[in-house]
């Protein structure tokens, strides 16, 4: 599959995708000038093995570290959690321990972010493989769960609570981590 931000779209391909949708949707697509139609694919990315440089002086945050599908409804939230966690780690480590802060940031965030990414896959599958006749019979079947672990998390408080133990654990496993 070709990836591009600006690959030209095809009106007939778009109409096929919405085959069973309301006629007004078909009319809107057919009224779109061909040269204005973009085939913008949503592409999944497996989690990176690490978000930090080998010397832990550079850290990726947000979509640069862990791109989310739009169905995750978590991209911006997770980027903010990254930012506040890194800020807490830098504050607590101090200027002389930036590499320790960066490593702690990754360790604190990594597993939570991977789990959050998986929610996007689940939602994507639920929405893209929907039996709309079943939804019509039971509208609640399409409702997404409100996952407290994801939506009610206080990343700043969490970072303050776990930083000391996380930083202490880094001494033994720094050499074992993959490098970027």
Stretch-by-stretch model annotation:
Residues 1-180:
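FAD-dependent flavoprotein oxygenase/oxidase catalytic domain
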């Amino acid at each position: 599959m070709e990836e591009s931000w600006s690959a030209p779209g095809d009106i007939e391909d778009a109409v096929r995708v919405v085959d069973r949708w309301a006629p007004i949707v078909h009319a809107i697509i057919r009224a779109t000038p061909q040269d204005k139609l973009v085939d913008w694919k949503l592409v999944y990315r497996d989690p990176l093995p690490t978000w930090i440089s080998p010397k832990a002086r550079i850290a990726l945050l947000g979509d640069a570290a862990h791109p989310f599908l739009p169905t995750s409804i978590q991209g911006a939230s997770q980027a903010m959690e990254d930012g506040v966690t890194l800020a807490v780690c830098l504050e607590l480590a101090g200027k002389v321990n930036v590499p320790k802060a960066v490593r702690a940031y990754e360790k604190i965030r990594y597993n939570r972010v991977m789990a959050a990414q998986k929610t996007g896959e689940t939602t994507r599958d639920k929405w893209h493989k929907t039996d709309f006749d079943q939804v019509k019979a039971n509208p609640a079947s399409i409702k997404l769960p409100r996952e407290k672990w994801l939506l009610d998390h206080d990343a700043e408080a969490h970072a303050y609570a776990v930083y000391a133990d996380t930083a202490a654990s880094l001494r033994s496993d720094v050499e074992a981590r993959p490098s970027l």
